[in-house]
């Protein structure tokens, strides 16, 4: 059982989608959560939905002072910080040749630098708590070369590498660091890019479909936060319907 009783978890990008569902599952497992996002109305509403175990704080992940405030708030409200889910991010859909330098820098700043600042800021609090678990949300695009993801893919490869080096550095402090790599999953954000639910829509994926809901990803996140994963660090967990394992026979044969 993924028991998070007595643990406090900060979840970025917590207003909706995967972040909100991870918060729901964490609270159901006994955790107290601080949802952090720039979508203040949605974030506050999600926190209200979750009741007394949840709080909401505004957080721009690229601003170090915002991080310091959120971590201090979590400690003041709940006494400790035991978990961090670095989920906030933005996507892109452009070829390398046509993507602007400005856009590339923006995506990397949010998706990668934001993860770095978050880990850097939370480490002292986790050391004070006697350890903790950091789950960084990367992507299937951080496991393979994927067209039309120049800035996004670069940032998610960076998250994967940053997770591994942090796991090496922080292991003796009893702080575990792992990355989760979702495949195409239906969320409010991905729906805007044309992601469709239903069997058979993605024949190049062994399971033939996208993730139907964020809950299919959130379960892996909560598992890594819990003590049932106490000997798991530096791992990269693909939750992608087998997409990064390899193409299906029908896809290879052009059927």
Curated annotation (Swiss-Prot):
It is an enzyme of class 1 (oxidoreductase). One of its GO terms (biological process) is C21-steroid hormone metabolic process. It catalyses: androstan-3alpha,17beta-diol + NAD(+) = 17beta-hydroxyandrostanone + NADH + H(+). SUPFAM superfamilies: NAD(P)-binding Rossmann-fold domains. Pathway: Lipid metabolism; C21-steroid hormone metabolism. The active site is at residue 152. The keyword Lipid metabolism applies. Keywords: Lipid metabolism, NAD, Oxidoreductase, Steroid metabolism. PROSITE patterns: ADH_SHORT. It holds the Pfam family adh_short_C2. NAD(+) binds at residues 10-34. Belongs to the short-chain dehydrogenases/reductases (SDR) family. NCBIfam families: PRK07231.1. Homotetramer. This is 3-alpha-(or 20-beta)-hydroxysteroid dehydrogenase. It comes from Streptomyces exfoliatus. The lineage of its organism: Bacteria, Bacillati, Actinomycetota, Actinomycetes, Kitasatosporales.
């Amino acid at each position: 059982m993924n028991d998070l009783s007595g643990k406090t978890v900060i979840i970025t990008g917590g207003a909706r989608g995967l972040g909100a569902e991870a918060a729901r599952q964490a609270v159901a497992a006994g955790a107290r959560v601080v949802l952090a996002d720039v979508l203040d109305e949605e974030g506050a509403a999600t926190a209200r939905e979750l009741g007394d175990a949840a709080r909401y704080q505004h957080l721009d992940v690229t601003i170090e002072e915002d991080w310091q405030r959120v971590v201090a708030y979590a400690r003041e409200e709940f006494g400790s910080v035991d978990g961090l889910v670095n989920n906030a991010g933005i996507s892109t859909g452009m070829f390398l040749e046509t993507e602007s330098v400005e856009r590339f820098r923006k995506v990397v700043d949010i998706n990668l630098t934001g993860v770095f600042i978050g880990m850097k800021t939370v480490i002292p609090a986790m050391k004070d708590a006697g350890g903790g678990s950091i789950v960084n949300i990367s992507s299937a695009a951080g496991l393979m070369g994927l067209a039309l993801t120049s800035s996004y893919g670069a940032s998610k490869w960076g998250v994967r590498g940053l997770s591994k080096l942090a796991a090496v550095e922080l292991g003796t402090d009893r702080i575990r660091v792992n990355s989760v790599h979702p495949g195409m999953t239906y969320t409010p954000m991905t729906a805007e890019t044309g992601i469709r639910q239903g069997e058979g829509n993605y024949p190049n994926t062994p399971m033939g479909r996208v993730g139907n809901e964020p809950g299919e990803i959130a379960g892996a996140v909560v598992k890594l936060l819990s003590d049932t994963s106490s000997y798991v660090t530096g791992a990269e967990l693909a939750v992608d319907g087998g997409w990064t394992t390899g193409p299906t026979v029908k896809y290879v044969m052009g059927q």
